[in-house]
Swiss-Prot record:
Protein function: Catalyzes the attachment of alanine to tRNA(Ala) in a two-step reaction: alanine is first activated by ATP to form Ala-AMP and then transferred to the acceptor end of tRNA(Ala). Also edits incorrectly charged Ser-tRNA(Ala) and Gly-tRNA(Ala) via its editing domain.
Cofactor: Zn(2+)
Family: Belongs to the class-II aminoacyl-tRNA synthetase family.
Gene (name only): alaS
Reaction(s) catalysed (UniProt annotation): tRNA(Ala) + L-alanine + ATP = L-alanyl-tRNA(Ala) + AMP + diphosphate
Subcellular localization, as worded in the UniProt entry: Cytoplasm
Gene Ontology cellular component list: cytosol
Domain description: Consists of three domains; the N-terminal catalytic domain, the editing domain and the C-terminal C-Ala domain. The editing domain removes incorrectly charged amino acids, while the C-Ala domain, along with tRNA(Ala), serves as a bridge to cooperatively bring together the editing and aminoacylation centers thus stimulating deacylation of misacylated tRNAs.
Name recorded for this polypeptide: Alanine--tRNA ligase
GO molecular function, one term: tRNA binding
Source species taxonomy: Bacteria, Bacillati, Actinomycetota, Actinomycetes, Micrococcales
Enzyme Commission number(s): 6.1.1.7
SUPFAM superfamilies: Class II aaRS and biotin synthetases (SSF55681), Putative anticodon-binding domain of alanyl-tRNA synthetase (AlaRS) (SSF101353), ThrRS/AlaRS common domain (SSF55186), Translation proteins (SSF50447)
Entry keywords, A to Z: Aminoacyl-tRNA synthetase, ATP-binding, Cytoplasm, Ligase, Metal-binding, Nucleotide-binding, Protein biosynthesis, RNA-binding, tRNA-binding, Zinc
Length: 885
């Protein structure tokens, strides 16, 4: 039995029993806590938990899912796959245990000729929660199974909850016995390999309390409405019904496996276990990547895009290990498309886009593999030869930095060779690289051409910084640099670097951005674009000559933009305060790893490995603003380095220290750091700290961003305006806005679900009218009709299948056309008798699509075509009738 046929039988079975057929949701979940849709129940969670009233009492679906938690197990077991389809039937306060169990047993054991799945009852076993006597008795009565074939298991396997207070309940699982060749007797409680779980029935009937783990929680009582949530693994049933060994060999996956084996010249199943695993990885990952890209995911270095990129790269490497070093995606992805398009036509309509994404990713990564694999192989061999078990961190860094080899791939390949990787050394080298990148950025800012130019000017003496105590300093021009070379003068319109004997302008350092301002002198005005320290002790001012002419040796007065400096001081002192607050809340392990501040804005990176909760963010913000309200004194002093360390001053800005360092105290010892930046005199001068963002900047670092001073007040004013407008528009007091908006969102989602259900019912309401339009072409019943305008091709497909199945066992063909998504689409469905008479849906769909100005095709029982000419729909339907005979 083909996978698509099992899919169809599932939906038909439950549709005939009053369930609303709900199309699969996207793999990209609406739930912000999930990267992907990971289970069939995910789209129904609001209904199952009671957050939103269900728009229907019963529902059924076949849901696309992605799980990559066990990605390393793919190909090694018969059951692990990254993409899978979960068949589900759901009851929202309607039927409960008895009906759910009866439905399951009926569908599984009804003969294939009567629309069931045709499992022999003697091959089926059942597990129930050990204390659920009700379920055990129902199974005994409904199935007639012997007592020993209904096994009671504990909470860890047969009790469902969300892991937190809320709905919970026992579950019952149905297993298929593959026979003694696969393991020992004794049922599912004894051996997982022999007994394959195919269906899980969850009986949501209780309210659970606080607790940890799978079984350490209290049951508080019954739920007011009892729900049913079941899941049957489509791929698992398919491999059992198709008589193959695992899910990689079913009709939707095996074609890719065979094509990969053909490309590699290594037949599948020839006892070469490692090669078979790699072929299964290719088959699984190609299908998963194709489905992800069809649902809009694109390769990237973070989030969903990174998961996709990893799947694609693992596929490339698996083919590489099979001996194929050329591009294979152009041969593999069309095969997967053809295997999946009958169930998901969007796979074909989106293929031009998705295939180009895949092919480009493969081309890029092949270059990486060519360069990096030989180096890694050599390093692994040398490590093993030396009797070591850990690959050096500098090797992993070289692969990452020079060849673009992702660290997760290095870890994976090293593990395959029985080695670990010195991750700590790798992380240190990455941190050093970031520091060098920062230095390179500084070099670009100062337009470095030859350090000797700066060194020569440095020989004249260090630049004296006066900006701690004044915003205006008189000095003289010691040197000029234009395009990296010394110059005697700069004229109006030129960009130059100016070296002064003394300056009030702060050069970028310690995370603080450079000051803005001007330099003026006799007959000239210079706008300061940037201020840097190209060599130790020398300050370079990058300027635009606004007017006049400036030459070496002339007097010069540096003028700091007072407003900018005020904002910069607020931000830098605010950084120290937030850092102290972070450590107060999170502990001493949360220490600063980087920062950047400029007028009105700061960001602070700190060592921490998980996101901060909203409550933690609020606490940090409150402690910070409390320090501002206390108007703490800010003092600076210069001390010997050893004395500063003895006082507990923290070294943060990553520069090499001299014997004497500058210590900044805020509120005495409350905050004490080594710092060369500019600061307010008292904390109240900061005004306000407004934490606006918290995010990840690596596996062990987080980043907070904040507005300070005037910018913080401006941001709050904008928020206040927005809140006021919302309050007015929604006629709701502002303190009730969150609840009101949540209610509106819930109502909107409920309305959308009701619309979907209404549209599905509206489609099915057309069935009787179409049945009355049946005609005959020879011995074949024919329904060829224009269905008007529908939301999606899925609606048209459901309508065609339903009409076909209602036409009975005599030869029947249904051809329906409609405008779906603004384009003409035709669906052709044939029953077995029509196919026996030589009428195939694929050929008819291709005929109709040709008239519509497009293309089409599919399988003998169900096919789709489309085009661009909607006016040709009548002619296309006529062509189908003519082609039948």
């Amino acid at each position: 039995m083909q996978t698509a046929e099992i899919h169809r039988r599932w939906l038909d079975f439950f549709a005939r029993r009053g369930h609303t057929v709900v199309p699969s949701a996207s793999l990209v979940s609406d739930d912000p806590s999930l990267l992907f849709t990971v289970a069939g129940m995910v789209p129904f969670v609001p209904y199952l938990t009671g957050i939103v009233p269900a728009p229907f009492p019963r529902a059924t679906s076949v849901q696309k899912c992605i799980r990559t938690l066990d990605i390393e197990e793919v190909g090694k077991t018969p059951r692990h796959g990254t993409f899978f389809q979960m068949c589900g039937n759901f009851s929202f306060g309607d039927y409960f245990k008895e009906q759910a169990i009866a439905f399951a047993w009926d569908l599984l054991t009804t003969a294939e000729t009567e629309g069931g799945l045709g499992f022999d009852p003697k091959d089926l076993w059942v597990t129930v929660y050990e204390e659920d006597d009700e379920a055990r008795e129902i199974w005994r009565r409904v199935s007639g199974l012997a007592e020993e074939r209904i096994q009671g298991l504990g909470k860890d396997t047969n009790y469902w909850s969300t892991g937190q207070p809320g709905p919970a309940g026992p579950c019952s699982e149905i297993f298929f016995d593959r026979g003694p060749a696969y393991g020992i007797d004794g049922g599912p409680a004894t051996d997982d390999d022999r007994y394959v779980e195919i269906w899980n029935l969850v009986f949501m009937q209780f309210l659970r309390g606080e607790g940890t783990g799978k079984d350490d929680f209290e049951i508080l009582g019954d739920l007011p409405k009892k729900n049913i949530d079941t899941g049957l693994g489509l791929e698992r049933v398919a491999f059992l019904k198709q008589g193959v060994e695992n899910m990689y060999e079913i009709d939707q996956v095996r074609p890719v496996l065979d094509r990969a084996a053909e490309l590699a010249g290594k037949p599948y199943g020839n006892e070469a276990h490692e090669d078979d695993v790699r072929l299964r990885v290719v088959a699984d990952h190609v299908r998963s990547a194709l489905m992800l890209m069809t649902d809009g995911v694109t390769p990237s270095n973070e989030g969903r895009g990174y998961v996709l990129r990893r799947l694609l790269r693992r596929t490339v490497r698996a083919m590489w290990l099979l001996g194929v070093e050329a591009a294979t995606f152009p041969a593999l992805f069309p095969v997967s498309r053809d295997a999946m398009k009958a169930a998901y036509p969007e796979v074909e309509t989106e293929f031009a886009r998705t295939s180009q994404l895949a092919y480009a990713e493969e081309e890029t990564f092949l270059r990486t593999l060519v360069a990096g694999t030989s180096i890694l192989d050599t390093a692994v061999a040398n490590t093993q030869k030396a009797g070591k078990r850990e690959l050096a961190g500098d090797t992993a860094f070289l692969l990452h930095d020079t060849y673009g080899f992702p660290i997760d791939l290095t870890l994976e390949m090293a593990e395959e060779a029985g080695l670990s990787v010195d991750r700590a050394a790798f992380d240190t080298l990455m941190a050093d690289q970031r520091a060098r990148a920062k230095a390179d950025a500084k070099a670009k800012k100062t337009a470095l051409a030859d350090l000797s130019v700066y060194s020569g000017l440095r020989a004249l003496g260090e630049t004296v910084f006066t900006g701690y105590t004044e915003l205006e300093t008189e000095s003289s021009v010691l040197g000029l640099i234009i395009d990296g070379h010394s110059a005697n003068k700069a004229v109006e319109g030129q960009v130059a670097e100016v070296i002064l004997g003394a300056t009030a302008l702060y050069a970028e350092a310690g995370g603080q951005d450079a000051d803005t301002g001007t330099i003026v002198g006799p007959g000239y005005v210079l706008d300061v674009l940037d201020v840097q320290k190209p060599v130790r002790g020398l300050v370079s001012h990058r300027v635009l000559v606004r007017s006049g002419e400036v030459g070496v040796g002339v007097p010069a007065t540096s003028l700091v933009d007072a407003d900018y400096r005020r904002g910069a001081k607020q931000a830098h002192s605010g950084t120290h305060i937030i850092h102290a607050a972070l450590r107060q809340v999170l502990g001493s392990n949360a220490h600063q790893s980087g920062s950047y501040n400029k007028a009105g804005y700061l960001r602070l990176d700190f060592s921490w490995n998980q996101a901060l909760s909203p409550e933690t963010r609020s606490e940090i913000e409150e402690i910070s603003n409390s320090a501002i309200r206390q108007n703490l004194e800010v003092t600076t002093r210069e001390l010997p380095l050893a004395e500063a360390k003895a006082l507990g001053a923290m070294a943060l800005f990553g520069e090499k220290y001299g014997d004497t360092v500058r210590v900044v105290d805020i509120g005495g010892p409350w905050s004490r750091e080594l710092c060369a930046g500019t600061h307010v005199a008292r904390s109240a001068e900061i005004g306000l700290i407004n934490l606006v963002s918290e995010s990840s900047v690596g596996s062990t670092n987080r980043r907070v961003e904040s507005l300070v001073g005037l910018e913080a007040f401006k941001d709050l004013a904008v928020e206040r305006t927005i809140v006021s407008q919302l309050s007015s528009s929604l006629k709701t007091p502002r303190e009730q806005l969150p609840e009101k908006i949540a209610d509106l969102m819930a109502s909107l989602k409920a309305a959308e679900k009701r619309i979907q259900a209404f549209e599905a019912r509206a489609v099915l309401d057309r069935v009787q009218g179409l049945l009355e339009a049946v005609s005959r072409r020879g011995a074949v019943q024919v329904v060829a009709a224009d269905a008007g305008t529908l939301s999606t091709a899925d609606d048209l497909r459901l309508l065609a299948i339903t009409v076909r199945d209602r036409l009975g066992s005599d030869p029947a063909t249904v051809a329906l056309a409609a405008l779906a998504g603004g384009k003409p689409v035709v669906i052709v469905a044939t029953n077995q008798a029509a196919r026996d008479a030589g009428v195939t849906a694929g050929a008819l769909a291709k005929t109709a699509a040709g008239v519509l100005g497009g293309g089409g095709g599919g399988k003998a029982d169900l096919a789709q075509g489309g085009g661009t000419d909607a006016t040709a729909i009548p002619a296309a339907l006529a062509a189908v009738s003519t082609a039948i005979g």
